Amino acid sequence: MNYYAAPMEGLTDRIWRQAHQRWFGAPEAPVRYYAPFLSPPENRVLIKKKMAELAPEANPGAPVIPQLLAKDGELAAWMIGQLRALGYTEVNLNLGCPAGTVTAKGKGSGMLRDLAKVDAFLDGVFSRTEGPVSVKTRLGVTSPEEFEAILDLYDRYPICELTVHPRVMRQLYRGEADRAAFAKYLPHCRMPVCYNGDITTPAQLKALEAEFPNLSGIMVGRGIIADPALLRQAVGGAPASKEELRGYLDELYHSYTESFGMASCAVSRM
């Protein structure tokens, strides 16, 4: 089973990834980190500050998967090329973000309103790039039943892994992830599938693995922020000790203070 840390804007940056890997990375539960989404610039001029988050030297020892938020397939393919030049193999496409500021622009899960545009986007990406490209998605915009047509579309492309968050766009993060809908559509997925949504305890993660043994991976988000030893515990390891938590939080505090130049900003981030 592959384990992933979900991309969360303002939380899972390079400083957090390094601290988590150092204090809670475990050989028995190796984790790959999705970086918070990057939007390809329309003028194709890369912003150094944003790219610094993905510089290989800024992420030593922490396996990272960059994520793109875009709606232009040709532009996304260009950005994938830039990331591959940095040494990244897999790149993820974000078709799942439900934030209003994102969906209003027709990006993230907002793309799911128009499957013809999703088709054109994916064609623009896969016709111009080679190598592993994964997708993170929601079930639809207003109803889980929309996923039947969405999945049929995804199956036309060589997606290396499909991460499904079983909520619809309109839910944002309210209510519960629709595990029944996920179970309904999982047998029809032709590509490897990763589950994401409402995994906050080791017991929940182990139960999910037992219920869906054919998953290629499990992605945890808020759960791994609240309990950084979650994955380690899920494979039989120890909970976070007081010493580990103190060292982990001290590293975050000092690293953020150095990055922001102010201790108050570090505390706000934490």
Locate predicted features.
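Flavin-dependent oxidoreductase catalytic cores
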Residues: M1-M270
